[in-house]
Amino acid sequence: MDTSAVSYLSSIVLNNNYKEWNNEKIIKWLSDTKKIQKVIVFKIYEITGRDLEFLSDKILFKMGVGIRDLLSFKSEFEILKNNYDNNNNNNNNNNNNNNNNNNNNNNNNNNNNNNNNNNNNNNNNNNNNKNNNNSNSNSTNINNNCSNNNSNNNHINFNSNSNITNIKNNDSKIKNKKEENKVPIIDLNQYEYVESISLGVFSVVGKYKRKGQENEFIAIKKIDILSLNEEKIIKEINKLYSINHPNIIKIIGYCKDQKNYYIASKYYPKGSIKKNTKQSPYSEMNAKRISVKILSGIDYLHSLNPPIIHRDIKCDNILLDENDDPILIDFGLSYKTIDDSTNLKTLCKKPFWASPDVNNQEIQIFSEKTDIYSFGCTIFEMIVGWESYSKKENNQPNLQKLPDNLTISCRLALGDIIGLEQNFKPDSKDLQKLSWFNESLPPIFQSQELTKSTTNTTTTTTTTTTPPPPPSPSSSSPSMNENKKIVTSDCLINSFKESGCLIFLNGELMYDNPFDKDCYQYNIVIPFGTPHLREVIHKDKNKSKHLDKIELFIDDHLAKGLVIKLGNFKLDLSKEFKKTPTFIDSIIEYLLDLLQKDNDDDDDDDVPESIILNIAVGFYKYISNFITYQYVLNQPSHFC
């Protein structure tokens, strides 16, 4: 390891000052020592701060770092970190020994002082007893308070804390009485039962109609008092009543009798998403619209103090209102215990979408991560459809079952939420930053032409059915930047229809794919939920034997300059793939599957030309279809 780099990294680790990591210096060292070939990924991703210490395999793989490079870099840093930790532990042990000696001396001195103080306090208390009993009690309390600094007055402290505890208990009882009256009381006699909506472990939800009113309905959940802690039920009712979010069910009142609690809420006649997805799966656009609003509700719940954990998010617990907006329901009220300090809940029944870590627990403990995992599974359930997974095993979704035409941003989001890596699950705020939850999904084919979307053009021309092409990207015309701003999916689709998708390497035409709607929407199922893609591939002997050839082919093409052209619009893939290394992984996975289907048993040392040809054809075909599809649909402005 380079001496200057060792000194530099050591100073960072020693001071825990990771924010000062000089990205350029690290990259230079990595490049000079050839520790990582694709060092540019560090610069692209702006790896700074605590990332130096917490560069997990998942992060590095997503950045496009190969397995060999990953192990090399991590081993260098681990050696440095371990050396620092060992030295630091030795120093801590020495300091602890010194502190223990000092503490022993201080304790001996304090004990002597405490004995003297106690004697003085007792004398004062005796004198006060002769004068006035009431004054005696007060002075004793004063003496006790003054003596709290002594280490031998635990008995006095215990009595004092007991008094405080009693006061707090009394206050909490008063608060509970106030909270019990906070939720409006409904008169159940004004409603008549219509039908059952759902049946739970400890509760039944029914549809009720207001007497004398034809179209006034409410939903009432009946909870058996004997099956749960009544105090907890009251607490949960008040907590749920205080929730105020447009996509979370709102309690409108409650009542109780000797056997049951009755909790009333608005009735939603459209039913749950599960009911709707039984007919057919949701489109990605519709699933996204619902998911964004549910995520907003989850973030609201998790941001409360203490946070509220739903613990059973699924399509069956999401209703649709009159505008088809989602309403998250059923916060349970069926928990065995609720830890007031952490609000973590344990449950007597297993949730529908249980994360692997929850499945492995004898006593199931739920946290915010539980909700995030089940939320991702709910998105999966909407897109795939209920019937496709009504007979699934272990309630674990299979990302390879996703529809072929999903956008790359959707696959990445689902991979992060329900992928194999359980230790790096994003929270609700992390999810809201992902592109899929932020960007709008434009229709693949829109009816309007380019002339309808470019209102800033000032040229006066006769009406034409086909819009004029923009100036060449190499032109120095002042209007070039204006044209770049108005690049839309419509522009690219029109150009694609006219001239097809052309792929150039070093300016030479390598592949010409004419426009075809079915071919254009061609897509591949990509297991983006597998963070250790290269590692998994290496374990598969049938696939790994071609991995080096594919990587060499791709690196060679990107180094020479790979460009997609749709008419006069072009996209420099050599630059784009550095920003989105996940595309490289998807290409590699596709090519490996393609070669495996050919059942090629030739040795690595004797590579037939047919393998290279298959790699080239598959490479260009994948780019001209799937990659082009993703950029035209999601990032048209990247074309120039």
From Swiss-Prot:
Ranges annotated as biased composition (Low complexity): 453-465
EC class (word): transferase
Residue intervals of the SAM domain: 21-84
Coiled coil: 73-100
CDD domains assigned: PKc
GO MF annotation terms: ATP binding; protein serine kinase activity; protein serine/threonine kinase activity
Active-site residues annotated for this sequence: D312
Highest taxon of the lineage: Eukaryota
UniProt record similarity statement: Belongs to the protein kinase superfamily. Ser/Thr protein kinase family.
Protein name: Probable serine/threonine-protein kinase samkA
Taxonomic source organism: Dictyostelium discoideum
Gene this chain is encoded by: samkA
